[in-house]
Amino acid sequence: MTLSFTARWRDELPATYTALLPTPLKNARLIWYNDKLAQQLAIPASLFDATNGAGVWGGETLLPGMSPVAQVYSGHQFGVWAGQLGDGRGILLGEQLLADGSTLDWHLKGAGLTPYSRMGDGRAVLRSTIRESLASEAMHYLGIPTTRALSIVASDTPVQRETQETGAMLMRLAQSHMRFGHFEHFYYRREPEKVQQLADFAIRHYWPQWQDVPEKYALWFEEVAARTGRLIAEWQTVGFSHGVMNTDNMSILGLTIDYGPFGFFDDYDPGFIGNHSDHQGRYRFDNQPSVALWNLQRLAQTLTPFIEIDALNRALDRYQDALLTHYGQRMRQKLGFFTEQKDDNALLNELFSLMAREGSDYTRTFRMLSHTEQQSASSPLRDTFIDRAAFDAWFDRYRARLRTEAVDDALRQQQMQRVNPAIVLRNWLAQRAIDAAEQGDMAELHRLHEVLRQPFTDRDDDYASRPPEWGKRLEVSCSS
């Protein structure tokens, strides 16, 4: 099968991009590619042949039909209007046409200078490229909407960050890279007709059922808000902190995008700050739901020229409804509840309070809870708590709640083990793979990618363990 590409963004949205070619790296070489995703997309294996050099994965060649552009957008960063931003080191190479008629963006990150690089060098480093590849694939296999990673190219190009590192490129795939910041850019340039063109593009290609409906814009924004609510609910249930929820890092399609200073919980800490540059804690874990709403309000403002205020407010209410409904459903599943009862939130919050006091490991606690037998007063989870009396009191109430369900242990445990992962991408696991890769050893990178494809499978090795001392509270920042 021949790959087919189109250039809808370039053809339909003039003045939203600059056309340019990638700038290859020195001695670029393919070090990893996503074999399963490549098979699903019918990408010929020959494209990954190392004897052909870095090829399209390193920006050295283009495939027929590709028409590369760097997109322009703006945004609020840490709550402050930052003005024009844009693809400062990424280039949208083209949009792959799939068999069902949909498309998939091929976006090369680290592809060199663009008109939107500002003070940057247009490069990505191996460290951050590996982190994004691991995070996006981990999220996908957890069932959370996300961009995908197709390939990583390493090089000998020196890149200066906090220390000198080496340049790399990531091929990132997504149904769309349309961001809240695209709309903000033209709204603040006082070009409302271009804001409406962006909305028309989104509806035409991603919500075509509404193209001829009079209230199409209001329906579309409601769905954007609902998708955002469901996404944030998913983050909160797995203990994921994005780290830099600027409006330019928010996807119109409700995808997790732009993995930078992210982190998954080790110990349960609702005030967890993944980004050591976030000195005020704006993007701490427990702030994510309110920040997403704030970001949606910024997007809503850009839509006021063609959506009534009442309709915008209804859509923002839809965000809250979607967030709370989806979060409640997911947390009941994590606890093994098939029905909703009035005291469920209190029971969950009591567990969270106990975990916070004890510094309990978030992922391991819920995974161990998945093995609970309602007739047994003992649990291996008990041994992880210092205050056994407090745990016993909670566990008795929990087992009593389980007995109100007409579900046997086997079925309940099966459900719980489908939503409570044994494996998440802890920062120390990513760092171990990065350290090895920077020394030229890619084995751990490949191994970790394989492990992350089965997050709901119990393991007895260190991929499911708490972090070693050196891996606790690793600091990550935006310097990618």
Swiss-Prot record:
E.C. numbers: 2.7.7.-, 2.7.7.108
Cofactor(s) it depends on: Mg(2+); Mn(2+)
The entry's keywords: ATP-binding, Magnesium, Manganese, Metal-binding, Nucleotide-binding, Nucleotidyltransferase, Transferase
Protein name as annotated: Protein nucleotidyltransferase YdiU
Catalyzed chemical reaction(s): L-seryl-[protein] + ATP = 3-O-(5'-adenylyl)-L-seryl-[protein] + diphosphate; L-threonyl-[protein] + ATP = 3-O-(5'-adenylyl)-L-threonyl-[protein] + diphosphate; L-tyrosyl-[protein] + ATP = O-(5'-adenylyl)-L-tyrosyl-[protein] + diphosphate; L-histidyl-[protein] + UTP = N(tele)-(5'-uridylyl)-L-histidyl-[protein] + diphosphate
Entry binding sites for ATP: G86, G88, R89, K109, D121, G122, R172, R179, D258
Keyword Nucleotidyltransferase: yes
Species for this entry: Salmonella heidelberg (strain SL476)
Family: Belongs to the SELO family.
InterPro entries tied to this protein: adnlytase_SelO (IPR054838), SelO (IPR003846)
Binding site for Mg(2+): N249, D258
Primary enzyme class: transferase
Described function: Nucleotidyltransferase involved in the post-translational modification of proteins. It can catalyze the addition of adenosine monophosphate (AMP) or uridine monophosphate (UMP) to a protein, resulting in modifications known as AMPylation and UMPylation.
Entries under NCBIfam families matching the protein: adnlytase_SelO (NF040880), PRK00029.1 (NF000658)
PANTHER family tied to this protein: PROTEIN ADENYLYLTRANSFERASE SELO, MITOCHONDRIAL
Active site, per annotation: D248
Gene Ontology MF, one: magnesium ion binding
